[in-house]
Amino acid sequence: MAYAQTKTIAVEKIPVIDTAPLRFGTSEAAQAVALKIRQAAEEVGFFYICNHGISEAVIEQAYRAAQGFFSRPKKWKNSVKINSNHHGFLSVGEAKMEQAERVDLKESFVWGLDLPDDHPSVTEKNPFLGRNQWPKEMPELQKGVYPFFEAGLQCGRNMMRAFALGIELPEDSFL
């Protein structure tokens, strides 16, 4: 995949959608949010969300843990170099979008849903699934970032429900 073409849009034209009703509201309130999301996707192609349920404390904890990891020397970070499940550290220049001519100029630490080795999705050799790897000398990385991942996963599930409702499908269609 090559880099996408972009267009300019005034920031004030990007809708900000309050997603709290997806978590706490009535089904009618959730439907109203879903319709706003659909309208934004169709008319603008992008939107911001607020009241998504990821607390500032969880965000700050993840940020501090990531800073602690990325401030370490490359040799140390390579102790958790990316594995066959695509979990772990990638150094500058090691990531490149498919068919792109240039590499990404960033470091990454990739983790995901932590699944045991005997989980059916892992034993079926699904790519990107499996046990995460964390640096043994830095247990605060996992403790700092995994709650952010879990909160983001829940937010994503709420958004998938809204996408389904917005196109008049049962809300669990994409879950």
Task: Please provide the spans of the model-predicted regions.
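Peripheral, non-catalytic segments flanking oxidoreductase cores
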Residues: 1-175
